[in-house]
Curated annotation (Swiss-Prot):
Lineage: Eukaryota, Fungi, Dikarya, Ascomycota, Saccharomycotina
Protein name: Genetic interactor of prohibitins 3, mitochondrial
A GO-annotated cellular component: mitochondrial inner membrane
Domain of life, per lineage: Eukaryota
A matching Pfam family: MMR_HSR1
Any single biological process term in GO: maturation of SSU-rRNA
Family: Belongs to the TRAFAC class YlqF/YawG GTPase family. GEP3 subfamily.
């Protein structure tokens, strides 16, 4: 009869939470790193053979003739331990946002030695948000810019490998007067450019980015693809697998690898300490995500289930990118609007016909005006509410929680980016004619900008680069303009606001001979 053999690191080595990296303890339930200690007095499952042995134990010959069921005695490998906070967040989507404290960039930067090799990660779908100009301009670091989640923007590998990097090089030179060592665009889901990224890594690398920028997922993809290990202990250079880890590897390579992976969650600030990994002969440090929230956290307003949809790339359908199915909305004098879950309300000018392709999970809904939409969705939350499936906000959210954004005048299609949420494309149909300004009412705490469609600028930059070096010839990104809820003349307010930022915009336009075209109030500043 064969009994289970248990492999556990609980008492054989000092361990951290396999998800967030803090030291585990089982004495103080309310303190940091608490986990529920497993009872070691395990009772083996009683099988029919056990019962037979108890009844006929003295009949040895009869026992030998019986068929022994060893199915319940297979080797069992324990999963890596995680703290209670991470367990509730990862498995039950239950968490207190105050426990996931924001970490300023300055604190993260202190953990990076001077002259280190830095991999700065940012999701390409929310470009140009999440790009840290301070980090890119820091000459004491050798920085590689790595964009993640490319499958949520681009249809194929060619766009990612050959087209968009040309535009990115020109963009950084134009808008930031700075260059990363290189720009690499990746997708862990489709495994785009993972080998390219690894080939550019140095002996020691520090992965830096904002929460949910995809750095931990990127590290996990490299660990799986190239079979790396998580370094436990402080002696990084001389790290070797101990006997227990070697036994685990011998029993199950797949299970062993799962224990090496970085903690990944749609919840920001899950990682709290620096964690090290070794892939072949290269060392990777995963640093906590940094953020500086000066306003409300979106967790206070948006339903946790909707936030999970927005942030989890694995549940995003690529059909949205490839098929580009659109919703239409015709503007009118009453302020007809279109919303996604009450998170934003788009109000087009009267008589304009517009096509919206939303790359954010959720269903769109139209209302008579923003007041009506905010009133209806603000009362949802109960299962009986007829529009509950369209509501992504918590009950009781009123108009005072929204910021009124004005989109600067534009020609042709644009993409509207909502930081930490996603983006949607907006295309007015027919011949261009100015009929008014587009408004966007967005929950406070969500940054908004607009950009030229990334697929289009990627293809355009690639085509023009075949004739020589590519230069950006028109503004490609812009902030929106914030106006008061009751502002009767937003166009005048936009003009006055533009005069305040015009000097910086004109400096860029004149330096690189950019042409304004119809985007004559576009501006962007980090």
């Amino acid at each position: 009869m064969r009994f289970r053999r248990y492999f556990s690191s609980t008492f054989k080595r000092l361990i951290d939470c396999n998800s967030c990296g803090v030291k585990l303890q089982n004495k103080q339930p309310g303190a940091l790193g608490y986990y529920t200690k497993k009872d070691d007095n395990l009772v083996k499952k009683i099988t029919l053979e056990d019962v037979k042995y108890l009844i006929f134990g003295q009949d040895i010959q009869r026992i030998k003739e019986m068929t022994v069921d060893t199915e319940n005695y297979d080797i069992k490998l324990e999963k890596p331990l995680i703290c209670k906070r991470c367990s509730e967040a990862l498995h039950n989507n239950k968490y207190n946002a105050t426990e996931f404290k924001d970490i300023p960039f300055e604190e993260v930067e202190k953990q990076i030695p001077l002259h280190s090799n830095v991999v700065h990660t940012a999701p390409i779908l929310e470009f140009p948000f999440h790009i840290n100009s301070q980090l890119l301009k820091n000459r004491t670091f050798n920085t590689t810019m790595v964009f993640t989640k490319a499958d949520r923007v681009f249809k194929n590998k060619k766009q990612v490998q050959k087209q968009i990097p040309i535009f990115l090089d020109a963009f950084f030179e134009t808008y930031l007067n700075s260059k990363a060592t290189r720009n690499i665009v990746t997708s862990t889901l489709n495994r785009w450019n993972l080998d390219t990224l690894f080939s550019f890594l140095h002996g020691t690398n520090y992965f830096v980015g904002e929460p949910n920028s995809g750095k931990s997922t990127l590290i996990n993809a490299l660990l799986r693809r190239l079979f790396g290990v998580k370094i436990r202990g402080n002696d990084v250079k001389n790290f070797e697998l101990d006997k227990q880890a070697e036994e685990e590897l011998a029993v199950s390579k797949k299970f062993f690898l799962e224990k090496q992976l970085a903690g990944v969650s749609h919840i920001p600030n899950l990682t709290r300490t620096l964690q090290a990994y070794k892939i072949k002969q290269k060392i990777i440090y995963d640093l906590p995500g940094y953020s500086n929230y000066n306003s409300y956290r979106i967790d206070e307003f948006i339903d946790p289930k909707w936030l999970q949809r927005f942030r989890k790339t694995s549940i995003f359908s690529e059909k949205r990118v490839k098929k580009k199915r659109y919703d239409s909305i015709v503007g009118n004098e009453n302020g007809k609007c279109l919303t996604l879950g009450g998170i934003f309300y788009l109000v087009p000018p009267p008589t304009t016909i517009n096509q919206i392709v939303c790359y954010i999970p959720g269903e769109l809904r139209q209302f008579h005006n923003t007041d009506r939409g905010i009133e209806v969705l603000g009362k949802s939350g109960s299962k009986e509410h007829p529009l509950n499936k369209y509501c992504g906000i918590k009950p009781g959210i009123g108009k005072e929680k929204y910021i009124r954004h004005i989109i600067p005048p534009f020609q042709g299609p644009i993409e509207v980016v909502l930081k930490d949420i996603g983006y949607f494309s907006l295309t007015p149909t027919g011949k261009y004619e100015y009929k008014g300004l587009y408004e966007l009412w967005v929950l406070d705490g969500i940054d908004v900008c607009i950009r030229k469609p990334l697929e289009r600028v990627a293809e355009d930059s690639y085509d023009k680069s075949q004739e020589g070096k590519y230069y950006i010839k028109e503004p490609v990104v812009s902030h929106t303009y914030v106006v008061a809820h009751n502002d009767p003349n937003p166009l005048q307010t936009v003009k006055e606001s533009y005069e305040k930022v015009k000097e910086r915009t004109d400096e860029i336009l004149n330096k690189y001979n950019l042409e304004k075209f119809g985007n004559n109030m576009w501006h962007f500043k980090w």
